[in-house]
């Protein structure tokens, strides 16, 4: 017992310092960060804010696209007139599938207008009627995918770059912390805790920006892939209907 008591007495200052370190004010740590670490934190915070704005806006856009596409497909297969479906497609402008149909319908109208409303397959073949419709569908689908993918690359960039930017801030902060410790000539827990926490908070900011970005980036890419598949399937079905009806 006489040997253990002095050991606890010697540890008491260190334990007190650890307790004080546990009560660190992280807001104050951020405010007292050096210029380089502060610039890193502001950059990561800005990237996180922009990412969340993109996530919210893109989630609403893709949800609207999916709902209206399902509504349009139901109307398409229940209707017997292309002109009435075209009016429905105009009302469902957020649906990429409806916009693909509109492009195909407009091109089909041009082809039928050229042949005077008569079903003359040789003349239509010479003008490349069905090929024109197919190209119009493909162009519209590519345009819709491009529009849906807008701003998503920023999420991918944030997901891949933010951890490294945060790591840079941490490395810089640790270098600064060790320099301060060297100048003070004292390396106890109370001296080390605050500057090391200041350095590590940059990594925390990097992860805070990167994790939602990578999760929603993969989610949005998956949703867009589904919509792209729906546009492709619809284009094939629409071309089959056009061939049977106008080019048989």
Where are these regions (language model features)?
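Alpha-helical transmembrane segments
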Residues: 45-65, 167, 174, 209-224
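Hydrophobic alpha-helical transmembrane segments of polytopic membrane proteins
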Residues: 199-213
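Juxtamembrane loop-transmembrane helix junctions in multi-pass integral membrane proteins
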Residues: 22-38, 147-153, 157-160
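Hydrophobic alpha-helical transmembrane segments and adjacent short intramembrane/lumenal linkers
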Residues: 185-199
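Transmembrane alpha-helix/interfacial motif
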Residues: 2, 33-80, 84-85
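Predominantly long cytosolic amphipathic alpha-helical stalk/bundle segments
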Residues: 66-165, 176-188, 215-248
């Amino acid at each position: 017992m006489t040997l253990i008591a002095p050991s606890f007495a010697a540890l008491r200052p260190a334990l007190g310092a650890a307790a004080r370190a546990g009560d660190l004010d992280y807001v104050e740590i951020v405010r007292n960060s050096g210029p380089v670490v502060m610039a890193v934190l502001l950059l990561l915070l800005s990237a996180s804010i922009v990412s969340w704005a993109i996530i919210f806006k893109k989630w609403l856009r893709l949800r609207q696209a999916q709902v209206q596409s399902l509504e349009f497909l139901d109307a398409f297969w229940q209707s017997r007139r292309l002109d009435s479906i075209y009016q429905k497609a105009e009302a469902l402008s957020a649906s990429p599938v409806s916009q693909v149909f509109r492009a195909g319908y407009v091109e089909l109208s041009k082809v039928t207008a050229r042949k005077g409303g008569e079903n003359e397959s040789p003349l239509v073949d010479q003008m490349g009627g069905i090929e024109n419709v197919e190209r119009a569908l493909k162009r519209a689908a590519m345009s819709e995918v491009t529009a849906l993918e807008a701003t998503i690359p920023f999420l991918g960039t944030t997901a891949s770059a933010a951890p490294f930017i945060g790591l840079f801030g941490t490395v810089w902060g640790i270098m600064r912390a060790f320099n301060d410790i060297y100048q003070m000539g004292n390396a106890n827990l109370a001296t080390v805790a605050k500057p090391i926490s200041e350095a590590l908070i940059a990594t925390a900011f990097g992860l805070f920006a990167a994790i939602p970005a990578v999760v929603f980036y993969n989610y949005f890419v998956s949703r867009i892939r589904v919509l792209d598949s729906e546009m492709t399937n619809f284009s094939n079905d629409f071309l089959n209907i056009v061939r049977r009806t106008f080019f048989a």
